From Swiss-Prot:
Pfam families reported for this sequence: Glyco_tran_28_C, Glyco_transf_28
GO biological process, one term: cell division
Localisation: Cell inner membrane
Gene3D superfamilies: Glycogen Phosphorylase B
GO cellular component term, pick one: plasma membrane
Alphabetic keyword roster: Cell cycle, Cell division, Cell inner membrane, Cell membrane, Cell shape, Cell wall biogenesis/degradation, Glycosyltransferase, Membrane, Peptidoglycan synthesis, Transferase
Superkingdom per UniProt: Bacteria
Species this chain originates from: Acinetobacter baumannii (strain AB307-0294)
EC number: 2.4.1.227
Catalyses which reaction(s): di-trans,octa-cis-undecaprenyl diphospho-N-acetyl-alpha-D-muramoyl-L-alanyl-D-glutamyl-meso-2,6-diaminopimeloyl-D-alanyl-D-alanine + UDP-N-acetyl-alpha-D-glucosamine = di-trans,octa-cis-undecaprenyl diphospho-[N-acetyl-alpha-D-glucosaminyl-(1->4)]-N-acetyl-alpha-D-muramoyl-L-alanyl-D-glutamyl-meso-2,6-diaminopimeloyl-D-alanyl-D-alanine + UDP + H(+)
Name the UniProt record assigns to this protein: UDP-N-acetylglucosamine--N-acetylmuramyl-(pentapeptide) pyrophosphoryl-undecaprenol N-acetylglucosamine transferase
Matching CDD domains: GT28_MurG
Length: 365
């Protein structure tokens, strides 16, 4: 290697598109790579949310025109190979022009052509799968990638190139104090249990409609913080209107500071997206997961099982959320000692150094 090659910063192209579940972990890794002196670029789709999220991040974006190929019409399926080929050549052109040294794919439609382009150019590829069930693109790329990162164990068949890293999470979440200390402090102060309900940015209609009636049946003192989405505030508030005196309820359209919300919660009730499960484990909070029933390959149930199987969480399928089932479940959980034990188990299965672990693997390629 020449002196000029040694002095040239490593150029890493990130590939992540479509959803925050792909983009946020990739962004955490990208920022850490930049801090270590790497040059970072991003392969994106023209209309994906990654363009908005990266607007102020000082990361140049290069777009290729690609869409999904699963479950679409006949004409689109027939055209798909040509679109993939065109997108692959576009990605190859960018990679050659930028002299990319390594490619890191975090999922989304863009990663398929991008990973293929890197392979054809002899550029090493790392992929990262956020869910417990591999997405279509990552499942295909795992065959050609040099390094395969999985957030949850056994997502991919065992191999020397498969590494369980966990999901990269924000620093604010990894900095949350230990669950034992938090729960014990609330217990000693005689505080009511804090129940946090999170439905995501749009809210989860099933949680908003079915949880209030069940929670109103409980007889212990509770502080309920229910994040329901901007469009469902009035309807959700109405369901709590006749709440008994033992309940204190706050209905919120969204939560600005999730780290604070996690740290103050004794129990969280939420969906089981990959990043949510990872943040719950990292924060150390007892959880009831209600997997999204329409999730591809039922991956949210698989995500939730990561914590449920070790006693850190309960799973309640949306189809079984009757008042009787919910009342029985919540009555069992209204015990801070039990919730403390669950929260401690959750923290024990967290991987707070996931971001640096993935960065180290990229640097070694």
């Amino acid at each position: 290697m020449t002196d000029s090659q040694q002095s040239k910063p490593k150029h890493v192209m990130m590939m992540a598109a479509g959803t925050g579940g792909h983009v946020f972990p990739a962004l955490a890794v990208a920022k850490q790579l930049q801090q270590q002196g790497c040059q970072v670029s991003w392969l994106a789709t023209p209309t994906g949310m990654e363009n908005r999220l990266l607007k102020d991040q000082n990361i140049p974006i290069y777009q290729i025109d690609i869409q999904g190929v699963r479950g679409n019409g006949v004409i689109r399926k027939l055209a798909a190979p040509f679109k993939i080929l065109k997108a692959t050549f576009s990605a190859m052109r960018y990679m050659k022009q930028l002299k990319v040294d390594a490619v890191a794919g975090f999922g989304g439609y863009v990663a398929g052509p991008g990973g293929l382009a890197a392979r054809l150019l002899g550029i090493p590829v790392l992929i990262h799968e956020q869910n417990a069930v591999a997405g279509f693109t990552n499942a295909q790329l795992s065959r050609v990638a040099k390094v395969v990162c999985e957030a949850f164990p056994n997502t991919f068949p065992a191999s020397e190139k498969v590494v369980t890293t966990g999901n990269p999470v924000r620093r604010e979440i990894t900095d949350i104090l230990s669950p034992k200390w938090r729960y014990d402090e609330r217990e000693q102060a005689g505080k009511p249990l804090n129940i946090l309900i999170v439905g995501g940015s749009l809210g989860a209609k099933a949680l908003n409609e079915r949880l209030p009636p069940a929670l109103k049946q409980l007889e212990v003192p509770l502080n309920i913080f229910h994040q329901c989405g901007q469009q469902q505030v009035e309807a959700t508030q109405a369901l709590y209107a006749d709440a008994p005196a033992n309940l204190t309820v706050q209905v919120l359209p969204f939560i600005e500071d999730m780290a604070k919300a996690y740290s103050e919660a004794d129990l969280i009730i939420c969906r089981a997206g990959a990043l949510t499960v990872t943040e719950v484990a990292t924060a150390g909070v007892a959880a009831v997961f209600v997997p999204l029933p329409i999730a591809v390959d039922d991956h949210q149930t698989a995500n939730a099982k990561f914590l449920a199987d070790v006693g850190a969480a309960k799973i309640c399928q949306q189809s079984t959320m009757t008042p009787e089932v919910l009342n029985q479940l919540f009555t069992t959980l209204m015990n801070r000692q039990l919730l403390t034990e669950m929260a401690v188990k959750a923290r024990q299965h967290a991987q707070p150094n996931a971001t640096q672990h993935v960065v180290d693997l990229i640097q070694k390629m």
